Amino acid sequence: YDYDYIKTQLTKEKLAVRRDNSMWRYRELLPVEESTPAPPLRVGWSPLYEAERLAEQLGIAHLYVKDDGVNPTASLKDRASSMAVAKATEAGAKVIACSSTGNAASSLAGNAAAAGMQTYIFVPSRAPKGKVAQLMTFGATVISVQGSYEETFELSKQAIEKWGWYNRNAAINPYLSEGKKTVGLEIMEQLDWKVPDYIAISVGDGCTIAGLWKGLKDLHAIGFIDRLPRLISAQAEGCCPLNRSIETGEPWHPMEENTLADSIAVGVPRNADKALMAIRESNGLVVNVSDEEIMAAQKLLGRTCGVFGEPAGVTGAAGLKKLCEQGKIAPDATVVAVVTGNGLKDVANAIAACGEPISIPSDMERLLTAFEGNGMSAPVIKCKKTPRKKCSF
């Protein structure tokens, strides 16, 4: 990018009055032609909540939760897919394809459907049914591959080369991280350009954390922020090749995909170099969390913030919690945790994390018994009676 030129075209004052509340409000920082229309679905400008109750529980001064699960297909991946659709439009493509553990697939299918494009989606057979249902609803041709994500990726790569489809795979298409970087641009604008100490995010193939870091560096280059935050790379213990590389100082090696957090279960990360560079350049922290810690974070976010994240979506928050418990985050720190996907994408694991509802017949005595059996007492709330007022006409 020509940052000197961008400085003449984009100012904080211009952004403040811009009405486009989507990722495309930052067009000057995005690699698209001026004449290229933004794709139909409104992606981005997701809410940033100040999570005071959760911050208090974790023992830190300020915590913000960026809920990217409210995007059109319910994940941060919509940012990459919106960019992919825009670039496919520029290329005159009518068919787009990708491989995915779930979120990138549903994201591409939805964004492409809105733009009138055909999609071919390759998913590993373990992909949650909720995500596959999204694909089918959006009219995608879905190929469920009986194998690992690595095998799924290789098959999609061969098919794309054979039939000449536009490639949305993150490792192949460099524009996708440019779409994902908008989450970082939004965080900083929503914080009124005040830089947090840390940004915590879940990591799978590495494209998201690499994009986040690129966006922050762009803002620093044009003078919108005066320093850069440290990144927190959170991975599942059962699949953490990138974090393990940082911890050991050795090159990354493939791992088995052994975690319920399907969206980050990537044993062979395709954006490893960019992700590792982002973590190292930011002097970032790495943390690996168990499936049990991930499920606990689902409950914690839901009950303190009202945010419902899928397992992979809350892994950043789970990692932050673990680091706080280990004393690695200072009590006066300001932290942003990015929730990358909505919990409705994986209802089965949400139920496993939070339990089943109380099931009884329509009987008050049975209700009281159920409360007592669960160690609960029904709250007694006395409502203040308000006298009726006479109406005069």
Role assignments for model-derived ranges:
Residues 1-393:
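PLP-dependent amino-acid enzyme catalytic core
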